[in-house]
Amino acid sequence: EYDGEPNGLKIHKDGRIFVADHRHGIMLVDEKRGTIEPVIIGPSKQRFKGVNDLIFAANGDLYFTDQGSTGLHDPTGCVYRYTVAGKLECLLDTIPSPNGLVFNVRETELFVAVTRANAVWRVPLDESGPLTKVGLFIQLFCPGPDGLAVDADGNVVVTHPGMGYVWL
């Protein structure tokens, strides 16, 4: 029996199905056995605040947001990378409610919907070291950016389900 709170879902290039579950962390669905099991439940034997969305890089690394109940009052949401080697890395840990995330076309930048700050952040990615120069991509006039996508031309698409808007 599954008692989770699924938020996001992605299919890995090898066909495995991963779920970002607010309650249980990153889960793996086994269609053949009819099971769903935890893959990552938290950093250093702690539990996540409440994972929200996930995306795979071309090399197979998994990036995901840990939103929980964070916000401007508690800007401790995180973006994690789980490498193909099995290493969990916290890339950012000062985000007021990280939500959806997407790479640019070349995977040199990660865009993160920061729901409670009404913004989308741009995160330059560098495999050789820590993140630097994280910045504001767009400041919205209303609360709650959620899902993100990038089209073939590199345009970032931002959804706001509460208002029924999609921005390109």
Predicted segments with their positions:
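Beta-rich, blade/repeat-based domains predominating
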Residues: 1-25, 44-62, 70, 76-78, ...
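Non-catalytic, surface-exposed connector residues within folded enzymatic/regulatory domains
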Residues: 20, 29-30, 73, 114, ...
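A short loop-to-beta-strand structural motif that recurs across blades of beta-propeller domains
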Residues: 25-27, 77-80, 119-121, 165-167
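Short loop/turn segments that connect beta-strands within beta-propeller blades
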Residues: 30-34, 82-86, 124-129
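Predominantly a core beta-strand signature of beta-propeller blades
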Residues: 33-38, 86-90, 133-136
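Conserved phosphate-binding/catalytic loop of the ribokinase/pfkB sugar-kinase fold
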Residues: 41
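Residue-level hotspots at or immediately adjacent to binding/recognition sites across diverse folds
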Residues: 65
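Anionic-ligand binding region
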Residues: 111-137, 141-144, 148
